[in-house]
Amino acid sequence: MKNYETYARKYPAIISMLIPAIVTTQILSSWFSQLQECWGTALSLIGVFVPIGVVYGAIGYFARQLFRDASKMFFQFPLFKEDETEMPTTKLLLWSSEKRLSANAIKTIATKLKEDFGIKLLSETKEQSNLLEAKKTIVDGVGKIREVTRNNPNLLQYNIDFGFCRNYLGGAVYSTSFLLIVLFVNILGVAGDWKFTLIALVFQILLAFAVFVTLKSKGYSYARALFNAYIGNTEYNW
């Protein structure tokens, strides 16, 4: 759990503050032209960036829960629903889902859930008449599966991969908002170069989009690994 907290929550929060730190460095360094003449451009930029980077890194570190909440609100819930009925873990166990596991795998998991926790997944026939109940039953079962596989070392990396992407996107919401405000200030002529900020903003959006595109696939990889850890206690290799 300590590794998850570090790699899936702290690191993405800190990394999401990198571009705002660079833009802030550009603005402040433009005010210190005399410093650049004395130290040289590269050295002065480093001298300005280091303390700024530390400050923004600290902001990301302490705001990581806010970033996590934002990632759920803006990305996870729209994709998978707040009640988790559209999560990859649910889709893989639904008979009617195109992305479902093999019939044999679903039956194996269903049997084990009934034996371990008394949770009975709906049959293929019953699912057709009550899809919502089938989804909610799966969600209940998945919650139990997560509890018993929490310390599985092979599953941890898949969990970190998904958590990193999701939580980075939460930080990207705040950093993008910050860059939009800075761009507005630049255009007003108060401080900084609006072209530099615009480039940084576009790069931030493209980077966040690239991470967002991988979020669903990371979710399915984690879901398959979760079920494999539950029924076989081995690394996902389907």
Q: Where are each of the predicted segments found?
A:
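N-terminal first transmembrane alpha-helix
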Residues: 1-101, 197-199, 215
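Cytosolic/matrix-facing juxtamembrane and C-terminal tails of multi-pass cellular membrane proteins
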Residues: 1-11, 209-238
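Transmembrane alpha-helical segments and their cytosolic interface motifs
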Residues: 3-19, 142-192
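Extracellular/periplasmic helix-loop-helix junctions in multi-pass membrane proteins
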Residues: 187-201, 217, 221
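Single-pass alpha-helical transmembrane signal-anchor segments
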Residues: 201-210
